[in-house]
């Protein structure tokens, strides 16, 4: 069971809901993933006018934890405003704080993220900041009181996988709140690797929504996250640079 503040999730795969070709594929992929939590940009949602299109109208949101994010925010003030809009609309108080500091790389702004987290914690939100693989920042955010840390695997939408396994592992080893690897996952092996490193969960979107078969990829990601989690718990063998036979040597004298 994954626990983020008071929120409990059976699945360790969190799925983004954007970029799907149509609502039917979106719904089938969400079902295949067996996720418990769906994340979405609050700015994309039609929260008040039921006559306007809703990008999640094909999904039965009553079955899932809604995990709104502040995508589109450039400052702490904007992120806090988006979070308050989500709360006023009756969404879950768990918020992914995403504040982009560079439009080309879509990398997060550490300073504005910290400021936003400080305010949102004071206002009673369950705060999950999206950050670069910076263990110093992660530790400061944990001290501040965030409920999870969401370091990127690689820049959003690139599918480059885990680009900085060393610094990601530093974060995993250094903090006690859940670590959710977010962004850059491109394949099931990327998701499994994140979990093998010791992450508590994986959040992804493009890897599923832009796959040739999003429904099959959603199932593959579900299995990969589960396999990586079990593998990490089982404990891999240490790496060695000398060969060691796996077969016994007894009986060779009779050959």
From Swiss-Prot:
GO biological process assignments: thiamine diphosphate biosynthetic process
Biological pathway: Cofactor biosynthesis; thiamine diphosphate biosynthesis
Binding-site list for 1-deoxy-D-xylulose 5-phosphate: 157, 183-184, 205-206
Molecular function as annotated in GO: thiazole synthase activity
The UniProt record lists the keyword Membrane: no
InterPro entries on file: Aldolase_TIM (IPR013785), Thiazole_synthase_ThiG (IPR033983), ThiG (IPR008867)
A Gene Ontology cellular-component term: cytoplasm
Localization terms from the record: Cytoplasm
Keywords for this protein: Cytoplasm, Schiff base, Thiamine biosynthesis, Transferase
Highest taxon listed in the record's lineage: Bacteria
Gene3D superfamilies referenced in this protein's UniProt entry, alphabetically: Aldolase class I
Active site: 96
Pfam families: ThiG (PF05690)
E.C. no: 2.8.1.10
Catalytic activity: [ThiS sulfur-carrier protein]-C-terminal-Gly-aminoethanethioate + 2-iminoacetate + 1-deoxy-D-xylulose 5-phosphate = [ThiS sulfur-carrier protein]-C-terminal Gly-Gly + 2-[(2R,5Z)-2-carboxy-4-methylthiazol-5(2H)-ylidene]ethyl phosphate + 2 H2O + H(+)
Function: Catalyzes the rearrangement of 1-deoxy-D-xylulose 5-phosphate (DXP) to produce the thiazole phosphate moiety of thiamine. Sulfur is provided by the thiocarboxylate moiety of the carrier protein ThiS. In vitro, sulfur can be provided by H(2)S.
SUBUNIT field: Homotetramer. Forms heterodimers with either ThiH or ThiS.
HAMAP family assigned to the protein according to its UniProt record, in alphabetical order: ThiG (MF_00443)
Family, per entry: Belongs to the ThiG family.
Name by which UniProt lists this protein: Thiazole synthase
Organism annotation: Macrococcus caseolyticus (strain JCSC5402)
